[in-house]
Structures are given as structure tokens and as C-alpha cells.
């Protein structure tokens, strides 16, 4: 496994627009600018660019691809923009989408190929703004250059689009244990952010630490030890880690005040036009996907409705694109070139 000390450096770093301004984000570029394929990669909590750098480096070579690595707003640290200068309240779902859109624009501008095919690759919390972006941009006739040709989601999958509600295959209901695990860790992270940012930094750290220990003791922590080395290699100090939990705070707050349902947090509706590859690790205490969406994609592949498909890496956890880079890379390259 590649560590932070051996990460392949980007060949170029270009700015992209966020709510913080024209230079709000930094896009790490890998590969030939005239490659026929381009891909934007974005991870989730609690990761900056580094988690995707090794994967992007190899994807650029083996997939004949220009790859741009971004991260969620507020998740990166640069000399000219330390994390303490990011928005104190964190970034809303709409803010995150603006960042994805800005990164795609910058990636398109960096590409010199006349007809490059765009793939979006998103992991964990990156899937949320990735899904919102693709749902919105596919409805914009005036922005064809920003529309992806294919999408790839790692380990998180949102519900089917509302237009599919009458054509969803049967799928098993999540167990009570799985539901409890999913709710508990989200609430712990949301409250940790709330306490640190608005009450006391010490209280935030105490609540986060006690909550983490309690989840381990009660076997409510969603991941197994297969992912421990990845966390260790990309670990940040506690205040930084807690600040990066702002998506959980906005999630809990939006569900509480009823605004969550206004967002198009779902799969995109036309899987034939824009095929979707979903890869997930099977070695976890819970899964971060909707079972009906997995069943939907499995039917797409089984019946040949689209090029969409699902792959489960049974022995891997949440960070399989780090711990089992070869298998993940093979699947993504094959999907992009199909």
C-alpha cells in the first residue's frame, strides 16, 4: 500500500472555482492532456487529495486518461490556504456541488483532446455532490461539455431516481443492526462538529473520542480492521478531523428541519445514456448503499438495459481502491473503455 511518504506527486496543479473564489480549490492533474479519456476523482470524509493520488497516477497510465483529483471544500491544506481559513460553518450540499462543477470545468480546460470522454469517480461523501452534480448537469442543454459520459461510485450508493419509483426490483430490507450502526456514527460525527464549532473545542474532542471508543466497544463502528492501515496513513489531528465532519452536521440538520428532501439525492434517471459502475467492499459491519439501488443496477447488467454494473470486492472494506488497488483499477479501466 502506498503511504503519504511515497505518493506520486501531481504533474500539475491547477486552481478551480469554489464558493471561496476562483482559486478556492486545487486540482491535481495526472496524465497526458491529449488523452481520449478524462476523469475527475473526489473522496469523502475525512480525506484530502492524497487518498486518490496513487489510484489517479495509475489510472492515467493504464487507462490512457487525464485524471484530475479534487477533494471536498475545506478538506485540503495548502500553504496559501490552511484549513483554519475555510468557512467556519462548513460547506452546504450546494457548496459542494459548485466545487465539483468548478473542478470539471478546470479539467476540461486542461484537456487538449477535441472529444475526450468524461468519467466522474466519487467515494464516500464525494458521492453526494457527485450525484447532485450529475442530476443537475444532465438537465442543462447549455452545458454539454460538463456532462459526464460515465459515472463510478465507490462504496456509497444513493436511492433510485424518483422517475424509477414504479420500476424498482425487489431488494432485501436493511437489518435493524445495520440501521443502528448507520445512525449512530452519523450522529456522533454531527454532534462532534456542532460542539467543537459552536460550544467548545475541548467538548467536541471529548465527545468525539468517547463516541469513537463507545462505538468500538459496542461493535457499532461501521468498519473493520481491514481499513485501519489506511486511516493511520492519512490521519490528521482531532480538531481537523472533527471540522471535516461538517457534511454529517448538514445531513442531520437538513433531515431535522425538513430541507433534506428538497435535494435530488439519488441516482441519475438515464442509466443507458450515462452508465454507472458501483464498486463496494464486502468486509464491513454495514453497507453504505441502498439495497434497491444495487438491485436496480444488477438488473441493468443482467438484462442488458445499459452498461451499468455492480462489483463487490468481498474481502475488502471501505477503502478498497487503496487496499486492493489492482482489482479496483482493472474494473474502472474496463468500464471506461467498454
Predicted feature residues:
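An N-terminal hydrophobic leader/cap segment in hydrolases
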Residues: 1-17
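A short loop-to-beta-strand scaffold at the N-terminal edge of the catalytic core in hydrolase folds
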Residues: 15-31
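Conserved HGGG/HGGXW glycine-rich cap/lid loop of the alpha/beta-hydrolase fold
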Residues: 31-80
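Alpha/beta-hydrolase fold active-site loops
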Residues: 36-37, 117, 308
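Flexible "cap/lid" subdomain of the alpha/beta-hydrolase fold that forms the substrate-access gate
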Residues: 46, 51, 75-115, 119, ...
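Short, amphipathic alpha-helical "lid/cap" segments that border enzyme active or binding sites
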Residues: 97, 101, 325-333
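Catalytic histidine-centered segment of alpha/beta-hydrolase-like enzymes
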Residues: 310-325, 329
